[in-house]
Curated annotation (Swiss-Prot):
Protein EC: 1.-.-.-
Organism, scientific name: Staphylococcus aureus (strain MSSA476)
Binding positions (NADP(+)): 10-34
Binding annotation for substrate: 140
Protein name: Uncharacterized oxidoreductase SAS2370
Keywords: Oxidoreductase
Pfam family, one: adh_short
Any one GO molecular function term: oxidoreductase activity
Keyword Oxidoreductase among UniProt keywords: yes
Catalytic center residues: 153
Stated family: Belongs to the short-chain dehydrogenases/reductases (SDR) family.
Amino acid sequence: MTVLTDKIAVVTGAGSGIGEAIATLLHEEGAKVVLAGRNKEKLQNVANQLSQDSVKVVPTDVTNKEEVDELIKIAQQTFGGLDIVINSAGQMLSSKITDYQVDEWDSMIDVNIKGTLYTVQAALPTMLEQSSGHLINIASISGFEVTKSSTIYSATKAAVHTITQGLEKELAKTGVKVTSISPGMVDTAITAAYNPSDRKKLDPQDIAEAVLYALTQPSHVNVNEITVRPV
């Protein structure tokens, strides 16, 4: 028996990169996985590599609260419960404050901050009612280390980290666990557009393994935060 047998997991941003790696690993470990993201074709490509009776594709824009509410509802209707939610959907745009690209600021705030909050608020009532569940938010080292071109992105990821810290305090003694995972540079299509190829990067699988570590601790242990860097 694998370690997550019959656990029901929702993964946002599951069509590629970190989200795809997380969803695939959780499925390999026995979880029933709901794949969420904007691009239905990419989600279906991921699903086609998994066992069809334990995977569900739900195209979802995390900036739309109604779609996120429906995502969680479909997950419960399809598999009969909800145990794990991974907020992996994210957007990284190189946008300085002095560039005045307000539309880019709004987009990153909507995806990275509001998307995380919408998913949490949709999943929490069920988890609180059953006194169990695990929320994992993918933050970033950029939330702690700001470059001249990452101010807004870094601010949104700092917010994700702070949201997770606050949730951990709010949910203490409820049985619901909360974890923030802050990766360094990860080799994905998003980072390829902004970073030199010779810079050391993590593999998306490295982040998936960190997620699995947090999920497989004893019931009395909550891993509050994990930082993952390339060496």
